Amino acid sequence: MRKIIIAGNWKMYKTQAEALEFVQVFKSKIEDTDESREIVLCAPFTDLGAMSKNLHGSRIKLGAQNVHWEEAGAYTGEISGAMLTEIGVSYVIVGHSERRQYFGDTDETVNLRVLAAQKYGLIPILCVGESKSQRDAGETEKIIINQLKRDLVDVDQNKLVIAYEPIWAIGTGDTCESSEANRVIGIIREQLTNKNVSIQYGGSVKPGNIDEIMKQSEIDGALVGGASLNPADFAQIVNYK
């Protein structure tokens, strides 16, 4: 049985005070949300400790946005899996296109991060997707299959979430047609040994398109960027019909 997982990726937004204010408002808007839907908030590192205390006993799971592959060491500015699990983090985004584009993540380092996350009991949300030029060149399928091949070496697919995020649709307002997202996610599923991995769509998800996205047979949730910053908008997404 594939689990529905809706995750908000706050990126580099929200101070601790803003995060706690969000949680207070958001909690009140999801009291009647279908219990089978997993709700995750992936917040900046500085928010996680305070949010963990605030979310204790609630149905909302806490997620981080990155994790280093080493347990400890002279890696200035990095955070390990052990540090995240200690403060109650359950999920971690790995391989987001912004990490690949701006911070030099490769399929090899993404694979190390996924393995480290699993080692410390975190569920990685592995992001894969093609750029505009790759899509225009008809390379979508090839690019994604290659990413998966490299990113999933030795990975336990029973403790994994995948997010298909077409890079050209992130933060641009351009949403991939839901039928096309469904087709690509079907291709992703074909590459997996565990066909029950939850696969999300990410890329300009908002209250106005979530119903259509979630009607698709292959799509098991969403990785939501900008629209997750507003508690009313994110609640609408979580409460899709």
UniProtKB/Swiss-Prot annotation:
PROSITE patterns named in the record: TIM_1, TIM_2
GO MF assignments: triose-phosphate isomerase activity
InterPro entries linked to this entry: Aldolase_TIM (IPR013785), TIM_sf (IPR035990), TrioseP_Isoase_bac/euk (IPR022896), Triosephosphate_isomerase (IPR000652), Triosephosphate_isomerase_AS (IPR020861)
Keyword Membrane: no
Organism: Gloeothece citriformis (strain PCC 7424) (Cyanothece sp. (strain PCC 7424))
Sequence positions that bind substrate: 9-11, 171, 204, 225-226
Enzyme Commission (EC) number: 5.3.1.1
Name listed for the protein in its UniProt record: Triosephosphate isomerase
Source taxon at top rank: Bacteria
Pathway the protein contributes to: Carbohydrate biosynthesis; gluconeogenesis; Carbohydrate degradation; glycolysis; D-glyceraldehyde 3-phosphate from glycerone phosphate: step 1/1
Compartments, record wording: Cytoplasm
Subunit structure: Homodimer.
Reactions this protein catalyses: D-glyceraldehyde 3-phosphate = dihydroxyacetone phosphate
Positions in coiled-coil regions: none
Uppermost EC category: isomerase
Keyword Cytoplasm assigned: yes
GO biological process: gluconeogenesis; glyceraldehyde-3-phosphate biosynthetic process; glycerol catabolic process; glycolytic process
Keywords of this entry: Cytoplasm, Gluconeogenesis, Glycolysis, Isomerase
GO cellular component terms attached to this protein's record: cytosol
Task performed by this protein: Involved in the gluconeogenesis. Catalyzes stereospecifically the conversion of dihydroxyacetone phosphate (DHAP) to D-glyceraldehyde-3-phosphate (G3P).
Family named by the database record: Belongs to the triosephosphate isomerase family.
Active-site feature positions: 96, 165
